[in-house]
């Protein structure tokens, strides 16, 4: 279904503006957000600038290097693997469609417009999808969501009141570990007391044995 929706957007952008508005209005009326089931949203991803996301080729190479076996497996691994499979297939079909349109449109301006639309607009959406799911598999969903919220707060804060550098995703797990370590002594406070209470018993038993 997702592939059908993406191809419909491209096909409706060619004939007339009216047909394009009808198709896009029908799709937008469904209020489909591919990130909702993962705790994120299109709006949350939009805080990241377009040049933040690697190229599709780099993202595909990363996904293939890290998760090729799982992606090619007939088994259901996780929702992120399934979403990655769909995004990769959608991009392949979009490339085939752009190639076909580019070869069959006689008007060079229209041909360039369609190819540019696929590469820029749809390309950005696919880059966002690939980055999100690869990052969730690599760093964990909670870490990625924490990063998106942190970056959203940072980018919306006036420059005079925010750190000079934006948050970095790869450093968030280290920060999370530090926070967990900082909280752990509070949970483990009873353990030293138990050890202390047990030590006199051992000493008493040893003294009794020595007396016997």
From Swiss-Prot:
Residues making up the propeptide: 184-212
Subcellular location: Secreted; Host nucleus
Record field: compositional bias (Basic residues): 178-205
Biological process annotations from GO: microtubule-dependent intracellular transport of viral material towards nucleus; symbiont entry into host cell; viral penetration into host nucleus
Repeat region (Sequence), residues: 184-190, 191-198, 199-206
Highest taxon of source: Viruses
Coiled coil regions in record: none
Gene3D superfamilies per UniProt: Viral capsid, core domain supefamily, Hepatitis B virus
Any single GO CC term annotated in Swiss-Prot or TrEMBL for this entry: host cell cytoplasm
Modification after translation: Phosphorylated.
UniProt-annotated stretches for the region 3 X 8 AA repeats of S-P-R-R-R-R-S-Q: 184-206
Subunit structure: Homodimerizes.
Family: Belongs to the orthohepadnavirus precore antigen family.
Stated role: May regulate immune response to the intracellular capsid in acting as a T-cell tolerogen, by having an immunoregulatory effect which prevents destruction of infected cells by cytotoxic T-cells. This immune regulation may predispose to chronicity during perinatal infections and prevent severe liver injury during adult infections.
Protein name in UniProt: External core antigen
Organism of origin: Hepatitis B virus genotype C (isolate Vietnam/3270/2000) (HBV-C)
This protein's encoding gene: C
């Amino acid at each position: 279904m997702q592939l059908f929706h993406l191809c419909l957007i491209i096909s409706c952008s060619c004939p007339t503006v009216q047909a394009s508005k009808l198709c896009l209005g029908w799709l937008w009326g469904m209020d489909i957000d591919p990130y909702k089931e993962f705790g994120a949203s299109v709006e949350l991803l939009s805080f990241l600038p377009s040049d933040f996301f690697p190229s599709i080729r780099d993202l595909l190479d990363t996904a293939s290097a890290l998760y090729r076996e799982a992606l090619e497996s007939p088994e259901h691994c996780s929702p992120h693997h399934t979403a990655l499979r769909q995004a990769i297939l959608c991009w392949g079909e979009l490339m085939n469609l752009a190639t076909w349109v580019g070869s069959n449109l006689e008007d060079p301006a229209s041909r360039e417009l369609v190819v540019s639309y696929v590469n820029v607009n749809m390309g950005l959406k696919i880059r966002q999808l690939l980055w999100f799911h690869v990052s969730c598999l690599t760093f964990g969903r909670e870490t990625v969501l924490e990063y998106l919220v942190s970056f959203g707060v940072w980018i919306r804060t006036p420059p005079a009141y925010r750190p000079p550098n934006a948050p970095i995703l790869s450093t968030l797990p280290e920060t999370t570990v530090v926070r967990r370590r900082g909280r752990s002594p509070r949970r483990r406070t009873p353990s030293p007391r138990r050890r202390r209470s047990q030590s006199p018993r051992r000493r008493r038993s040893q003294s009794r044995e020595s007396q016997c």
